[in-house]
Curated annotation (Swiss-Prot):
GO MF entry, a single one: lipid binding
Name of protein: Non-specific lipid-transfer protein 2
Source organism phylogeny: Eukaryota, Viridiplantae, Streptophyta, Embryophyta, Tracheophyta
Domain of life, per lineage: Eukaryota
Presence of the UniProt keyword Transport in the record: yes
Function: Plant non-specific lipid-transfer proteins transfer phospholipids as well as galactolipids across membranes. May play a role in wax or cutin deposition in the cell walls of expanding epidermal cells and certain secretory tissues.
Signal peptide stretch: 1-25
CDD domains hit by this protein: nsLTP1
Family named by the database record: Belongs to the plant LTP family.
Keywords noted in UniProt: Disulfide bond, Lipid-binding, Signal, Transport
Disulfide partners: 29-76, 39-53, 54-99, 74-113
Gene Ontology biological-process entries: lipid transport
Any Pfam family matching the protein: Tryp_alpha_amyl
Length: 117
């Protein structure tokens, strides 16, 4: 039950963060949150890396093909990262590599998403 509450908070935080952002991106923070939701235990509780997490990271990377989409995904991930005080920063930064995915930015609480291309 606590995990569902955290997921609900994550989705809400992403929507609040992305609400005022105007862009041509097709990705919403709700979509991004759905892709990375299976990663929450890995990123906050030092749990094992679930297959569903890597599937979500791969699918998100495949959807974020344009610069606006990559910037929007980045903003959503930064917003989500900031909503979890127990986020393991090293695991978040290393998540793409752990899943065999190459993304053009570091997942962290302080990533400048405007510089993402």
């Amino acid at each position: 039950m606590a995990g569902l509450m955290k997921l609900a908070c994550l989705v809400l935080a992403c929507m609040i963060v992305a609400g005022p952002i105007t862009s041509n991106a097709a990705l919403s923070c709700g979509t991004v949150s759905g892709y990375v939701a299976p990663c929450i235990g890995y990123l906050t509780q030092n749990g094992p890396l679930p297959r569903g997490c890597c599937t979500g990271v791969t699918n998100l990377n495949n959807m974020a093909r344009t610069t606006p989409d990559r910037q929007q995904a980045c903003r959503c991930l930064v917003g989500a990262a900031n909503s979890f005080p127990t986020l393991n920063a090293a695991r978040a930064a290393g998540l793409p590599k752990a899943c065999g995915v190459n993304i053009p930015y570091k997942i962290s609480k302080s990533t400048n998403c405007n510089s993402v291309r």
